[in-house]
Amino acid sequence: MSKNTISLSIYDGSEGMEYIVHKNGDVNITTIHNGGIESEVDVDVECFGFETPEGLIADLIDQGFEIQWPV
């Protein structure tokens, strides 16, 4: 993952979601169902009502998403 992106995820067993938020405002969303990828979509932070990536990131953290730090 590049230094211009941040990954946030939330999982409950084999269900969950991952958001990869890019500095330029692009967002990749992956939905996990029964341990496998169910859907993937690419959108912009403005689709969520935010003008900047930081606003979306703060909202996701408030919802319980966790930042996935590089290993």
Predicted features and spans:
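A short beta-strand micro-motif
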Residues: N4-D12
